[in-house]
A protein has these predicted regions:
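Non-catalytic alpha-helical coupling and interface elements of nucleotide-dependent molecular machines
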Residues: 25-28, 49-57, 86, 115-120, ...
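Core RecA-like ATPase module of SF1/SF2 helicases and allied nucleic-acid translocases
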Residues: 90-194
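Short secondary-structure boundary segments
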Residues: 197
């Protein structure tokens, strides 16, 4: 088995990280830990760890960056999306951007704003995109809009994390799940993450 309790974001589909954690306690199993992070610039990993370590049901573990250059971390409000879209338009490297959303309904809103800025984009269907389709979509010179769940396992140079991440909900599971979702979203970014919440 391979797993990362910090990225266990499928409780709503019946996924239970406790099963995995219990297996790790089994004396008949040998556990190996992958501690090096090769993807994220140091400060992106730092903010992701700050978010996840506030979750109540995660193991404490050592994750260290292998990239020590500083990336860019921006935290702003959702209503500033257009400002950052204009920067993408000016830069012109559309394929270097993901816009990750919490819920599917935000994809439509973002699509409209990208069209208003004349920025090419593609959207992904959660669970309905084959590997061949995924490769073709990823190679297009267009901004990719997808849910955080769909983005799991992917990476890009720049990520805008857009939406309502209710990480202060009173429910124990809700708080932990939302922190894990936010962690996954932040860690898709290699060089720059813009969090619009």
């Amino acid at each position: 088995f391979v797993g990362d309790d910090w990225q266990s974001i499928y409780r709503f589909k019946g996924g239970d990280v406790r099963i995995f954690l219990n297996l790790m306690q089994n004396p008949d199993w040998t556990s190996y830990y992958l501690s090096a992070n090769y993807r994220n610039a140091k400060n992106i990993m730092d903010i992701a760890k700050t978010v996840i370590k506030q979750a109540d049901d995660v193991m404490d573990k050592l994750v260290y960056p292998t990239r020590f250059e500083m990336g860019e971390v921006i935290v702003d409000t959702k209503n500033k999306l257009k400002k950052y879209l204009r920067q993408i338009e000016k830069d012109g490297n559309y394929k270097d951007w993901f816009i990750l959303v919490r819920v599917n309904k935000d994809i439509y809103e973002i699509s409209k704003q990208l069209e208003e800025c004349d920025i090419p984009y593609v959207t992904f269907k959660q669970g309905g995109t084959s590997n061949e389709e995924l490769d073709a979509l990823m190679s297009e010179d267009a901004v990719k809009i997808l849910t955080v769940h769909t983005s799991k396992g992917l990476e890009n140079k720049n990520v805008i994390l857009y939406g309502n991440f209710p990480i202060k909900q009173p429910s124990y599971h809700r708080n932990s799940d939302e922190r894990k979702i936010m962690y996954v979203g932040i860690t898709r970014a290699m060089d720059k993450v813009i969090i619009l919440n």
